[in-house]
Amino acid sequence: MAQHTFLVEIGTAELPPKALRSLAEAFADNFKAELTKADLAFGDIEWFASPRRLALKVHALASEQPSKSVEKRGPAVSQAFDAEGKPTKAAEGWARGNGITVEQAERLVTDKGEWLVHTAKVEGRPAKDLLGELVASALAKLPIPKMMRWGDKTIQFVRPVFTVTLLLDGELVPAHILGIDSARTIRGHRFMGEPEFTIDNASQYPQILLEKGKVVADFMARKAKIKADAEAAAAAFGGVADLDDALLEEVTALVEWPVVLTANFEEKFLAVPAEALVHTMKGDQKYFPVYDKNGKLLPKFIFVTNIESKDPSQIISGNEKVVRPRLSDAEFFFKTDLKQTLASRLPRLETVLFQQQLGTVKAKVERIETVAGFIAERIGANVAQAKRAGLLSKCDLMTNMVGEFASTQGVMGMHYARHDGEDEVVAVALNEQYMPRFAGDALPSALEACAVALADKLDTLAGIFGIGMLPKGDKDPFALRRAAIGALRIMTEKQLDLDLVELVEEAVRVYGDKLTNKTVVTDVVDFMLGRFRAAYQDEGIGADVVLAVLARRPTRPLDFDRRVKAVSHFRSLDAALALAAANKRVSNILAKVEGELPTAVKPELLQDAAEKALATQVAELQAELAPLFAAGDYQAALTRLAALREPVDTFFNEVMVMADDEALKANRLALLNNLRNLFLQVADISLLQ
């Protein structure tokens, strides 16, 4: 069968830059699914995306769907013929509907009887007859939270659509998509190249767009060019560009013909904390800051323009003029803020509401102060410094700088605390209290900062759960999931052996009588433990491993982590699945026992060699593993327990647990109970799959 190249390009108004790549990838994924569903064979699919277009190029596309044989079953033979052997009306009607006579029908014999059947050949439809509807369906399924209407049309899309091009090799595929008829016309760059031109063949894309339209349609190629050019521009004056990937992607989505330029700002602005300057450059202007080899901010920035200018100096000058007032604002805010100490701003936190039922931010920092001291005492941190950092933790919210540049909260608190002469540990904790801010982010460095970060997160969790405002579905306005995962990461990765129950009880206690949820402690602990599942799955650890540990509900995250790592290692052993199955069998047997399970094994009642051998090993392991369990060395313990595979298998093959003799039965149940309890010291491995 012949293979073809298919192109679809949707020409639009400027697409939302932060969503551009995800829209293009979703378009490609959706179209793959549509082709597969339509049974049209295809090879590679390339996706293209620029501010004013989404496009796909499909290679090795089949000419048509394959022909299929479809079996159409008719009435049962017993119902198809009368007593004289003549076709009934039901048989004739079915045959006529399939374009055959009853005599031409085949017979199908099944265990339920004999049936008339006709095998019809259904010819596949040509690809060109299907592509329009497949493209429309793929576009309709794009993840677009907010649609737009334009002109007098009722059609909706993420942005207005101006051109639609569908080409199968050199043939224009007729289609009417998003209110536009398919045509060969595509649009070039808004200011350079040909504004509109025709494309003759799908194979010309995207080269024709580059040559005639001055558009680099390949998103990844544009991104690579911007990155390489920015790195070279910074290196030219001994600098290193801060090419944050999220900003790099956004800038890539803003331009069709990227041109990288370098500009300067006045050195006097370097007296302002770098974080504030960087916020202005990256957040407001989409510029890339530049640092020297030692990580010190330089008075330069790199930006990307969407046009080749005959006089780049004018564009550079224009961007310098744009950023200067923003940097001047930052300088003014910083100098103004320095006129007051952080501590003097504490009373003003009484005017800021944390949550209506939970009170003000001032009340929150007083709770954080208490809980941070409670935690610091348990992890060997300086209690006074942890409490001081907790009390000052939100004071920078009252500064001009944070009021204008919200993302600088925490870090500006650190700078102002240093200026005020606060202890360095306290100053750093003010910045690190929000760590980790996102998945993979760094953790607080000092123990005092860990105490404040934990106290802040636990206060939010206890408070919001305490008034019954649990996160539902994807709605989590107080970022409780992030707070829980962050707290767990701090405790496990910083090796802080803390008990969640004890921590949450303290966080609840300092709220006094504000909380109405009577089960808040259990709810918060269960919620936090539940976050482990997603966190470990991201590390490639199976859900069954986490569930096996969750079944034991260990409430010390560090201990929980050790158990998960131990069970994950155990799962890789040859004996693991057999012992998991045996534990499940033991669990089922013990579940049927009424009353309290026996634990005392009487040696004189052991009759069979298999039960004697198992009893001996279980008794030896109980003594041997006790210190390992006490030390939390669960991996070593489970590795030793793997040796029970053979005696357990032999026991079940040779011993009748539910013996008629009640004394024998009770003794064997006690043996199995002791066996199971050995494993339950770590996890419920019967849940392993």
From Swiss-Prot:
One of its GO terms (cellular component) is cytosol. GO terms for molecular function: arginine-tRNA ligase activity; ATP binding; glycine-tRNA ligase activity. It catalyses: tRNA(Gly) + glycine + ATP = glycyl-tRNA(Gly) + AMP + diphosphate. Pfam families: DALR_1, tRNA_synt_2f. Keywords: Aminoacyl-tRNA synthetase, ATP-binding, Cytoplasm, Ligase, Nucleotide-binding, Protein biosynthesis. InterPro entries: DALR_anticod-bd (IPR008909), Gly-tRNA-synth_bsu (IPR015944), Gly-tRNA-synth_heterodimer (IPR006194). SUPFAM superfamilies: HD-domain/PDEase-like. GO terms for biological process: arginyl-tRNA aminoacylation; glycyl-tRNA aminoacylation. Its EC number is 6.1.1.14. It is found in: Cytoplasm. Its main location: cytoplasm. It comes from the Bacteria. NCBIfam families: glyS. PANTHER family: GLYCINE--TRNA LIGASE, CHLOROPLASTIC_MITOCHONDRIAL 2, GLYCYL-TRNA SYNTHETASE. Tetramer of two alpha and two beta subunits. Belongs to the class-II aminoacyl-tRNA synthetase family. This is Glycine--tRNA ligase beta subunit. It comes from Aeromonas salmonicida (strain A449). The gene is glyS.
